[in-house]
Amino acid sequence: MYKRQGKGFAKTTISDIVQQAGLAKGTFYLYFKDKYDLRDKLIVYKANQLFDDAHRALEKANVSSFEDELLFTTDYIIERFQKNHFFMEFIAKNLSWGIFKSVFTNGDPSFSSQFYDHYMTALKKYNVNCPAPELLLFTMIELIGSTSYNCIHNSQPVSMEEYLPYLHRSLHHILLAFTE
């Protein structure tokens, strides 16, 4: 919404939001503490959709190792970001570890933990000994989000196509660093 008005999130007010949505302010405050709470819930919702979609695509793919699953998922997410720059800006710039973790652990039945559950199961399935699986996931998400954003949005320092082989190698080495 704030993107369409050209204001940016910082200058968008609750009044702008409720007017655009056709709500009363009281109704807004029944569901959200402030505009940041709304933004965080939207990020959680959209990230949940993204990871569920990635999980469904992964289930249909023919992969034979944990690393191949990670690379497939990485490529899937990057492809989605390349197709929808606004979605990428919204998710990649705002998806902190705390928000990401809440997607999978908030206990809200409207959110799925399929991706996270699959990730944990895949570690066992492929006999990957990772003493800190959440830290591994955090590191990969941070790397993928920040580097893909700059390469896709700004083509800096290079295009995503040029960067992708380096990202894959980096993820390979991160996986080695986190596993025994």
Predicted segments, located by residue:
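Conserved small/polar residues in nucleotide/adenosyl-binding loops
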Residues: 1-5
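Helix-turn-helix
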Residues: 6-37, 41, 45
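Short, flexible helix-adjacent loops and helix caps
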Residues: 8-9, 55-63, 92-96, 124-128, ...
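Short, structured helix-loop boundary elements
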Residues: 14, 40, 44, 67, ...
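Hydrophobic alpha-helical connector segments
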Residues: 41, 55-83, 140
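Amphipathic alpha-helical packing segments from all-alpha helical-bundle domains
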Residues: 48, 52, 99-127, 134-138
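Amphipathic alpha-helical segments used for helix-helix packing
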Residues: 68, 80-102, 117, 149-153
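Hydrophobic/aromatic-rich alpha-helical bundle segments in the mid-to-C-terminal region
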Residues: 124-170, 178
